[in-house]
């Protein structure tokens, strides 16, 4: 004998709920909102730009690339200005024939000084022994963008009248994020809405408005920043600041049920810096060898210790300017966040 547990009305209501859940599941498979968080200069905005490249039918049009030409010029000029200012503070002499070139760069006003003349001066200055000596002391005595050498090394290409920036130029261009960037991309048949918020302290109060309906949080931390200080507060170590910020995010009530993905970024720079700057100089409790694998595991453990136990935090070592690396990582992230998010339906 069969018993009816529900009347027709209850059965119909149950069916509607099941359909609603299935609709939500399908929508989740197609619509994913990712929140990119992290301190300033961690590489968040570079990853945001990578999404335009790795998405289906992605990449930058010639028109879009040309929009970055002025940013390329500006990055070259501002970074040489930083080197010249630092060389003066460090009492490092430039070669006699380059002193006028240095004056040209320092007194320039954007739009008034022809780019080709400034570029020629920058090219000669980058070959100056004094500038090379100054460059070797970056991070320790002054701040310089990670891609400064890349731009100087490519100055001949930038001096061509038919110069069109390539995707590496775009990825390496430093354009400070001062607000909220939001864009939609399609990656592996999933529609991603990615929100990138400025990481400087003054920008973080804006984050709260982005917390609704977030599928996952991607926190970007620069591993190579362990010996550097904040631009906005030179008394604060960048990695210490990043750890404190991650602790705040991972323990936030808004994200109790939200997957947290940690990108330990700039792994390439971290590997190179370890050859020059021991991790022990900034983390006295680190007792392992000054090798990439051991040091990276220590940095990872510092971040994982900020979260409540036994919460799972998905970690990936990344290089934001390496398109293939970011594509590989996002495929892993896609599977992880969808699997976990669907468990809650």
Swiss-Prot record:
One of its GO terms (cellular component) is phagocytic vesicle. Residues 261-268 are annotated as: G4 motif. Mg(2+) binds at residues 45, 177. Residues 30-345 form the G-alpha domain. It holds the Pfam family G-alpha. Keywords: GTP-binding, Magnesium, Metal-binding, Nucleotide-binding, Transducer. GTP binds at residues 38-45, 171-177, 196-200, 265-268, 320. PROSITE patterns: G_ALPHA. Residues 169-177 are annotated as: G2 motif. InterPro entries: Gprotein_alpha_su, GproteinA_insert, P-loop_NTPase. SUPFAM superfamilies: P-loop containing nucleoside triphosphate hydrolases, Transducin (alpha subunit), insertion domain. Residues 192-201 are annotated as: G3 motif. One of its GO terms (biological process) is protein localization. GO terms for molecular function: G protein-coupled receptor binding; G-protein beta/gamma-subunit complex binding; GTP binding; GTPase activity; metal ion binding; mitogen-activated protein kinase binding; protein kinase activator activity; protein kinase regulator activity. Residues 318-323 are annotated as: G5 motif. It comes from the Eukaryota. Residues 33-46 are annotated as: G1 motif. PANTHER family: GTP-BINDING PROTEIN ALPHA SUBUNIT (PTHR10218), GUANINE NUCLEOTIDE-BINDING PROTEIN ALPHA-4 SUBUNIT-RELATED (PTHR10218:SF180). Guanine nucleotide-binding proteins (G proteins) are involved as modulators or transducers in various transmembrane signaling systems. G alpha-4 plays a role in morphogenesis of the multicellular structure. Belongs to the G-alpha family. G proteins are composed of 3 units; alpha, beta and gamma. The alpha chain contains the guanine nucleotide binding site. This is Guanine nucleotide-binding protein alpha-4 subunit. It comes from Dictyostelium discoideum.
């Amino acid at each position: 004998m069969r018993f009816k547990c529900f009347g027709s009305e209850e059965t119909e209501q149950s069916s509607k709920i099941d359909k609603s859940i299935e609709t939500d599941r399908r929508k989740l498979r197609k619509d994913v909102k990712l929140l990119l968080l992290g301190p300033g200069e961690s590489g968040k905005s570079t990853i945001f730009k990578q999404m335009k490249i790795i998405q289906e039918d992605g990449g930058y049009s010639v028109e879009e690339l040309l929009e970055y030409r002025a940013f390329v010029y500006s990055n070259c000029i501002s970074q040489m200005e930083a080197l010249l200012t630092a060389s003066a503070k460090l009492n490092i002499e430039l070669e006699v024939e380059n002193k006028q070139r240095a004056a040209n760069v320092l007194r320039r006003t954007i739009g008034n000084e022809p780019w080709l003349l400034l570029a020629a001066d920058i090219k000669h200055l980058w070959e100056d022994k004094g500038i090379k000596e100054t460059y070797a002391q970056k991070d320790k005595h002054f701040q310089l963008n990670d891609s400064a050498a890349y731009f100087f090394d490519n100055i001949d290409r930038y001096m061509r009248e038919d110069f069109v920036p390539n995707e590496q130029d775009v990825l390496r261009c430093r354009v400070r994020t001062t607000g909220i960037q939001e864009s939609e991309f399609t990656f592996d048949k999933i529609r991603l809405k990615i929100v990138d918020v400025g990481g400087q302290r003054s920008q973080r109060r804006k984050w709260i408005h982005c917390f609704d309906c977030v599928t996952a949080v991607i926190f970007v931390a620069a591993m190579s920043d362990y010996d550097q200080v904040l631009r906005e507060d030179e008394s604060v170590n960048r990695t210490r600041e990043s750890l404190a910020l991650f602790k705040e995010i991972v323990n936030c009530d808004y994200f109790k049920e939200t997957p947290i993905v940690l990108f330990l970024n700039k792994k390439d720079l971290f590997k190179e810096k370890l050859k020059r700057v021991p991790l022990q100089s900034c983390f006295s409790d680190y007792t392992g060898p000054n090798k990439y694998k051991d040091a990276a595991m220590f940095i990872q453990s510092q971040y994982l210790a900020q979260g409540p136990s036994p919460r799972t935090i998905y970690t990936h070592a990344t290089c934001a300017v390496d398109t293939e690396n970011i594509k590989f990582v996002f495929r892993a992230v896609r599977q992880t966040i969808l699997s976990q998010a669907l468990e809650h339906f």
